Amino acid sequence: MIPEPAIVVCTTNARCLDVLKASVKAYVPRNIRTYYFHGVGATFGEAYNHAARIAFKEHDQIVICNDDIVFTPTTWRTLLADVALLKEAVADLGYVAARSDYARGAQNIRSGTGRLDFLRFESERSIIETPVIAPICAWIHRDAWVDFPPINWFSDDVQCADMKRRHFISRAYVHHVGSQTCGNDAAKCMADAEPWLKANRPALHAVHFGRV
């Protein structure tokens, strides 16, 4: 097995891919292998299940990346430093995900807490545990991996719960354009996911749709 983590990217329209590639080239060590998959699977989950299976044949660990993110000069170094710390402290480690400016909950830098210090919230200096992360740019080990469900919205919730692992938000940051895969029609995204959730995860369905 190759000891270094691989970067795994799935893309549909590839509108932002050139910028991601440029930032990877500029800020990620040259020995890190990157896998790009275009037009695989009908959903986000199906695409990344396919991509992870291929990458895990040669790597014990991968970093899942959306195609519409941009690395900073410190993203890779900080993310892997936090992974190393957590490996020592957490036996059942799941995802370790970068923060961004377009993410849910505490993973979004706008949700920071504490005083502002050089335009960053104090909380951005800390690793934070959370039950669900969005793998916009997220490290995961093959031993923790379980497949995504065949849906777009709420696939993160399902996968993170099915892993039965502890997930963390890193101090690392990536810029995220957002809504390039599923689009901006929230009502449609909700409606597309509802039948699968109702049939397979009724408790989660009740949380988001208010009925079983």
Where does each model-flagged region fall?
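Short, acidic, metal-binding catalytic loop of nucleotide-sugar glycosyltransferases
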Residues: I2, V19-T34
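A short, glycine-/small-residue-rich helix N-cap motif at loop->alpha-helix starts
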Residues: G39-A47, A52, N152-F154
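Active-site nucleotide-sugar/metal-binding loop of Leloir-type enzymes
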Residues: N49-Q61
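Short beta-strand-to-loop acidic/aromatic patch adjacent to the donor-nucleotide binding site
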Residues: H59-V70
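Conserved donor-nucleotide/metal-binding helix-loop-beta segment in metal-dependent transferases, i.e.
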Residues: W76-Y95
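Short beta-strand-to-loop element that shapes/binds the nucleotide-sugar donor at the catalytic cleft/hinge
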Residues: G94-S111
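A recurrent flexible, glycine/aromatic-enriched loop bordering the glycosyltransferase active site
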Residues: L119-I140
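C-terminal catalytic/acceptor-binding lobe
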Residues: P150-V212
